[in-house]
């Protein structure tokens, strides 16, 4: 909890999110779940947490169960977001001001056995969210990823073709 409180109290322009609807996909994952907790700790943001694992969400977000600012819905990003509102009790056409896309099948086993399906799901999922956001007045979109997308490589600083990719190369 100390890290969550520390992040929530960071000197950021939080006022831009005050009263806004923020969608966090991958909310039952490590990064998405932490982002949900930081946003909820702020106390003035409407958080819509979306994930595939409803049981995990009930345990992880139990303290927010009766909080009117917290909403969880089961969602697989490979489906258009508009399908969710038609097939569930969620309000249709929620205007998400900000979308934080932290959902992906991060399982190495899934990528090893069905890499094309995993890649397609990531591409279509991102496209689905961007299209929904554009149609509903989204202000900003944040895509969360990992260095794993670059693969193992094998290059070093001394590789004849040039230096290896470093985190500092990307800011």
Task: Enumerate the language-model features and the residues they cover.
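Conserved Rossmann-fold NAD(P)-dependent oxidoreductase catalytic core, especially the SDR/UDP-sugar
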Residues: 127-171
């Amino acid at each position: 909890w100390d890290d969550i409180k520390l992040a929530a109290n960071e000197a950021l322009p939080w006022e831009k999110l005050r009263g806004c609807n923020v969608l966090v996909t991958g909310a039952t994952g490590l990064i998405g779940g932490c982002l949900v907790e930081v946003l909820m700790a702020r106390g003035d943001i409407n958080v819509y947490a979306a994930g595939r694992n409803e049981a995990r969400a009930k345990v992880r977000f139990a303290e927010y169960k009766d909080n009117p600012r917290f909403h969880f819905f089961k969602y697989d990003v490979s489906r258009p977001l508009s399908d969710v509102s038609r097939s569930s009790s969620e309000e249709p056409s929620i205007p998400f001001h900000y979308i934080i896309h932290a959902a992906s099948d991060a399982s190495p086993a899934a990528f090893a056995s069905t890499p094309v399906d995993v890649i397609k799901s990531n591409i279509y999922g991102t496209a689905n969210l961007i299209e929904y956001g554009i149609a509903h007045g989204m202000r900003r979109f944040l895509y969360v990823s990992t260095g794993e997308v670059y693969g193992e490589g094998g290059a070093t600083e001394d590789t004849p073709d040039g230096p290896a990719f470093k985190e500092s190369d990307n800011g």
